[in-house]
């Protein structure tokens, strides 16, 4: 993704929107001369809204990892496709989705995947102080309510 972006920029393209497999890389502005507006999918089953929230991007990348699309259902239990590297077993987490903004797709995708296997508290501790990473979490609490948390500058350009 980042190679495609750089290749197009070298050839004079200024306003770019590239999406491959859920990773997004934007440059410049949309056709109305404004920042690109990207929808973050709702991880809530049977939700009336398919978009949970939107974020504006300018000259940045966005990647989202979630447990709501790729899972195995066995005996009424959803088994997450994210694997804990320490145990080799599927992660059990209340985190439903993590979206990461970064200056490139490589970092955004890697951090979205890494944060997906951590709790919110573990994840926010890992990325605090990293200026190039902003993140947005969607998770469920112990009562099944859907909540969101995000870093200070996630919604800023």
Question: Residue locations for each model-derived region?
Answer:
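Mature catalytic core of soluble alpha/beta enzymes
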Residues: 1-157
């Amino acid at each position: 993704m980042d190679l495609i972006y750089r290749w197009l920029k070298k050839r004079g393209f200024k306003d770019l929107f590239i999406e491959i497999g859920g990773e997004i890389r934007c440059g410049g502005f949309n056709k109305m001369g404004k920042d690109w507006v990207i929808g973050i999918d709702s991880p809530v089953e049977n939700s009336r809204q398919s978009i949970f929230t939107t974020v504006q991007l300018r000259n940045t990348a966005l990647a989202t990892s979630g447990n709501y699309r790729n899972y195995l259902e066995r005996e009424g239990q959803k088994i997450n496709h994210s694997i804990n590297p320490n145990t080799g077993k599927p992660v059990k987490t209340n985190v439903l989705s993590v979206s990461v903004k970064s200056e490139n797709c490589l970092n955004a995708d890697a951090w979205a995947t890494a944060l997906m296997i951590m709790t919110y508290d573990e994840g926010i501790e890992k990325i605090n102080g990293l200026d190039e990473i902003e993140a947005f979490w969607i998770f469920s609490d112990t009562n099944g309510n859907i909540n969101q948390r995000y870093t200070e500058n996630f919604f800023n350009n």
